[in-house]
């Protein structure tokens, strides 16, 4: 969708901003109704919303500035960030399965990004955005382990509201890389597509991502989330002309295998 919106004139990530605003408009009546009933509306979760929404926005914008495979792999280095955050903030000690996950993830990252140098680093602004997005989103996931909410609605509404604010600020701050704000005509011409993907894709997937850990367990969800790497790598090789070779295949496979091992080898009490 990002590439389609960009081709339709919504450059600079403004397509994502439009989707976020549509989500806010659709969910606002429910938020108001919940507030009148004395229930949580989601507005009282700014920190959580900024972390989850901001991480996702960085991820979405990175696709406009780097290759699909690079964005996927850098964003899904989240096991590294969650391990660091769990040690620092939750005082958890990582087990053997987590260490194996980290080694495989780092190994996969090295294989993909070590074409030019032995010590690879992100090469462009899109790479850095994807890496930062993974770290921010991981912080949001850690936050979800700590807070208690009245169902999934407060989370999804805070994601859209505070994610929109983050997206607008990021759009202006990164205008040198993403380009200026599009014309009104561009928004009008893409309005039907924006509404369609917001209602049938953006909002439902957001609900599933934020709701599923409490229903399916973190282990199964981690495998499902990592499966996006497989889908993304495969689709990018079919739909785009971006680099796709043995490095991308092996590197992404190592990250996915690491996620599976983390679940299979985890102690039963977890």
Label every PLM stretch briefly.
Residues 18, 72-77, 144-163, 202-238:
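Helix-helix packing/entry segments at the starts of transmembrane helices
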Residues 3-4, 27, 82-83, 119-178:
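Transmembrane alpha-helical segments that form core, pore/gating elements
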Residues 20, 226-270:
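C-terminal-most transmembrane helix of multi-pass membrane proteins
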Residues 26, 31-34, 78-103, 230-249:
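C-terminal transmembrane-helix exit sites in multi-pass transporters
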Residues 4-5, 15, 62-63, 71-74, ...:
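Hydrophobic/aromatic residues within transmembrane alpha-helices
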Residues 1, 46-61, 65, 111, ...:
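Hydrophobic alpha-helical transmembrane segments of multi-pass membrane transport proteins
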Residues 9-13, 38-41, 114-136, 176-197, ...:
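Juxtamembrane helix-entry segments on the extracytoplasmic side of multipass membrane proteins
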Residues 27, 97-115, 247-266:
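Hydrophobic transmembrane alpha-helices of multi-pass small-molecule transport proteins
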């Amino acid at each position: 969708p990002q590439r389609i919106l960009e081709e339709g004139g919504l450059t600079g990530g403004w397509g994502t901003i439009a989707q976020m605003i549509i989500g806010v408009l659709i969910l606002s009546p429910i938020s108001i109704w919940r507030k009148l009933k004395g229930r949580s509306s989601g507005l009282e979760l700014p920190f959580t919303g900024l972390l989850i929404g901001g991480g996702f926005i960085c991820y979405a914008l990175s696709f406009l500035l780097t290759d699909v495979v690079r964005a996927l792999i850098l964003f899904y280095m989240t096991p590294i960030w969650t391990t660091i955050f769990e040690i620092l903030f939750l005082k958890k000690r990582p087990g053997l399965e987590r260490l194996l996950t980290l080694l495989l993830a780092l190994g996969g990252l090295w294989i993909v990004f070590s074409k030019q140098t032995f010590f690879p680093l992100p090469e462009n602004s899109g790479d850095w955005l994807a890496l930062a997005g993974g770290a921010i989103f991981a912080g949001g996931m850690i936050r979800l382990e700590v807070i208690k909410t009245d169902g999934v609605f407060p989370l999804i509404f805070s994601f859209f509201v505070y994610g929109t604010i983050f997206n607008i600020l990021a759009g202006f701050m990164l205008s040198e890389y993403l380009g200026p704000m599009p014309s009104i005509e561009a928004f009008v011409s893409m309005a039907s597509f924006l509404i369609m993907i917001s209602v049938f894709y953006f909002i439902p997937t957001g609900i599933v991502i934020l709701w599923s850990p409490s229903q399916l367990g973190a282990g199964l969800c981690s495998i499902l989330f990592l499966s996006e790497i497989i889908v993304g790598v495969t689709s990018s090789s079919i739909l785009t002309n971006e680099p796709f070779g043995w490095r991308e295949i092996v590197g992404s496979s190592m990250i996915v295998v690491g996620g599976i091992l983390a679940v299979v080898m985890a102690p039963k009490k977890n």
